[in-house]
């Protein structure tokens, strides 16, 4: 399908949303009340919610057939998949990491992982995390692939289970306030095939990303990101960001999504395949092809003669994700928040967590060709440059180096995490676990794990007064 919608350029003025056609002639004008004390995060896709569903609301422009498709995509995202091959919610397994998109991304956020609460693979093996494994030479294990699936349908053996233990180390700020960092140690056990010797194994765990601003990220002006990479060099602070480039659908593209900017799209098709074991037109083979779980699945009645999810359904999920609104900032008139924003700049956090970017004029295109021009021409505030930065390898022995290479990203290089919506994570998902594997239990720990190119900002934060540090955290909570 290749549906093209008439292009509208949205211009946000004080209190008014005006739509113009390509000639600049005004064709629509409607009032959009901006509550006092709020700040727009994503232009016309900003929503004004401060609740457990703040990440899970459609943008204002979603209407008509797109509202219907949004609802359909929302259902496919949230509803529990089954093993039935009946063309509706079926096709799960035989091995999987999550039983729906929403199982790991509750309310389009980050489901609380079991790494802290249950020490690894939790009840029925569910961790709300992805377990990546490679040989130490970078090769994949033929019996497992890139991800260990710790869930399986009834009667089928999972590929393995995850156990995590923690090393704790106490520190102090110069003013005497204590803080603690926790380093995870990951272990795979109950391998379905031959156990892999620890000395030949790299294991990294990724907890879910917030699905905030996905449409804006897909519509972002790629040239602006490349320009940032060209001039993102601040030797006085040890900062030099670079873009990641990857090959998807046979085309070399700028990476934007994922922990290491290792994807050019929202990986809907890959998520159905790798995370849920559901075959589709892009990934028609079972994720456990060649493994014993295929035969076990057949014995349990699983069929392999049809695709488990249609391209139309996957595009509706893509539409849902790209049409979600971005929560407006809160408490922007609070004195502590205002002071905290000053501290954010004083600590040079903005050099990587870039405050303002723009989307390309014509918006984004969904996986099957539907265009979303409403996302075009917007001023957005994601607090990210979407570039790779070396985050260090020396804190507690390993820092944030996970030894996992993705495209041009080395193990110690990570995409700058967008911060929009981060202050609502506790309200939406009930926890404040941050960083790629959830090792940081709060904002302070997340900052203090910064090494490498983040070392200067960490030290500037570290040497602030407690009042200034608290105000910087108050600013982060307003995002």
Place the predicted regions along the sequence by residue.
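Bacterial Sec-dependent N-terminal signal peptides
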Residues: 16-42, 49, 55
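Electrostatic cytochrome c docking/interface patches
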Residues: 53-92, 316-345, 359, 364, ...
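Bacterial N-terminal signal peptides that target proteins for export
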Residues: 1-8
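The canonical Cys-X-X-Cys-His
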Residues: 96-108, 211, 317, 340, ...
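Bacterial N-terminal signal peptides
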Residues: 8-16
């Amino acid at each position: 399908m290749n549906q093209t919608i008439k292009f509208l350029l949205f211009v946000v003025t004080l209190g008014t949303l005006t739509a113009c056609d390509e000639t600049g002639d005004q064709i629509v004008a409607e009032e959009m009340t901006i509550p006092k004390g709020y700040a727009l995060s994503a232009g016309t896709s900003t929503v004004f919610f401060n609740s457990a569903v703040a990440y899970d609301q459609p943008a204002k422009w979603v209407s008509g057939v797109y509202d219907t498709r949004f609802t359909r995509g929302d259902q496919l995202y949230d509803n529990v998949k089954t093993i039935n091959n009946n063309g509706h919610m079926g096709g799960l397994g035989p091995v999987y990491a999550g039983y729906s998109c929403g199982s790991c991304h509750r309310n389009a956020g980050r489901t609380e992982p079991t790494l802290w609460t249950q020490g690894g693979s939790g009840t029925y093996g569910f961790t709300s995390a992805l377990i990546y494994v490679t040989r130490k030479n970078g090769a994949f294990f033929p019996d497992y692939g890139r991800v260990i699936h710790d869930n399986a349908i009834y009667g089928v053996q999972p590929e393995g289970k995850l156990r995590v233990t923690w090393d704790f180390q106490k520190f102090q700020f110069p003013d005497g306030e204590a803080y603690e960092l926790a380093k995870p140690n990951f272990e795979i056990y109950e391998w379905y095939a031959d156990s892999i010797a620890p000395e030949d194994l790299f294991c990294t765990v990724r907890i879910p990303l917030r699905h905030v601003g996905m449409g804006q990220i897909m519509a972002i002006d790629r040239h602006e990101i490349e320009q940032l990479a060209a001039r993102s060099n601040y030797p006085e602070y040890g900062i030099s960001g670079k873009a990641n480039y990857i090959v998807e659908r046979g085309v070399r593209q700028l990476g934007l999504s994922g922990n290491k900017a290792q994807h050019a799209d929202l990986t809907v098709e890959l998520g159905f395949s790798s995370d849920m074991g559901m075959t589709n037109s892009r990934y028609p083979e079972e994720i456990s092809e060649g493994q014993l779980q295929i035969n076990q699945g057949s014995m349990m009645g699983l069929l392999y003669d049809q695709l488990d999810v249609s391209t139309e359904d996957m595009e509706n999920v893509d539409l849902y994700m790209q049409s979600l609104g971005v929560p407006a900032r809160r408490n922007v008139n609070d004195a502590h928040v205002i002071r905290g924003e000053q501290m954010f700049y004083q600590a040079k956090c903005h050099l990587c967590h870039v405050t303002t970017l723009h989307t390309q004029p014509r918006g984004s295109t969904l996986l099957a060709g539907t265009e979303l021009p409403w996302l075009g021409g917007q001023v957005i505030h994601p607090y990210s440059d979407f570039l790779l930065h070396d985050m260090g390898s020396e804190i507690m022995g390993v820092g944030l180096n996970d030894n996992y290479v993705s495209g041009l990203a080395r193990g110690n290089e990570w995409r700058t995490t967008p911060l929009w919506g981060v202050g609502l994570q506790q309200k939406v998902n009930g926890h404040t676990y941050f960083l790629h594997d959830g090792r940081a239990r709060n904002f302070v720990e997340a900052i203090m794990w910064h090494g490498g190119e983040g070392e200067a900002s960490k030290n500037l934060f570290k040497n602030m007064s407690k009042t200034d540090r608290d105000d910087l955290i108050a600013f982060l909570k307003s995002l």
